[in-house]
Amino acid sequence: MKIVDANVLLYAVNTTSEHHKPSLRWLDGALSGADRVGFAWVPLLAFVRLATKVGLFPRPLPREAAITQVADWLAAPSAVLVNPTVRHADILARMLTYVGTGANLVNDAHLAALAVEHRASIVSYDSDFGRFEGVRWDQPPALL
């Protein structure tokens, strides 16, 4: 399973981004493929928050469109909603201890912990995922 980070979701809908085409191509292909695509609430909520933010994109999505997009992704046959297990708090603490910080890496550490719990990899443009011990991650162009 591959768990999708918010930046891939945002690039997939932002047609002005240089990462739009590889992100959309990977996401569409993954959602129509046989392998599971993991979605977690933190990246999904970040997508809704940022995709609808005036001034961030040339044409922010209307709230309804962003919510519908999330629903469409989750309705795909290969989509799986990934939730923390009972081991999550311990794994999350280990991830934060390993990188020696919290702050801006807390959400990344949460996603990294989910990946470890579910034996998944992360798809993201954020190289910070390379800092977490035992976490596999790829950028969409490398997966095409």
Swiss-Prot record:
CDD domains: PIN_MtVapC25_VapC33-like
Binding residues annotated for Mg(2+), in chain numbering: D5, D90
Cofactor: Mg(2+)
InterPro entries from the UniProt entry: Mtu_PIN, PIN-like_dom_sf, PIN_dom, VapC_family
Keyword Iron-sulfur: no
Residues covered by the PINc domain: 3-137
Subcellular location: Secreted
Biological processes annotated in GO: negative regulation of growth
Coiled coil: none
Pfam families: PIN
Gene Ontology molecular-function annotations: magnesium ion binding; RNA nuclease activity
Keywords, alphabetical: Hydrolase, Magnesium, Metal-binding, Nuclease, Secreted, Toxin-antitoxin system
Any GO CC annotation of this UniProt entry: extracellular region
The EC number(s) this enzyme carries: 3.1.-.-
Function: Probable toxic component of a type II toxin-antitoxin (TA) system. An RNase. Upon expression in M.smegmatis inhibits colony formation. The putative cognate antitoxin is VapB37.
Family: Belongs to the PINc/VapC protein family.
Name of the protein in question: Ribonuclease VapC37
Native source organism of the sequence: Mycobacterium tuberculosis (strain ATCC 25618 / H37Rv)
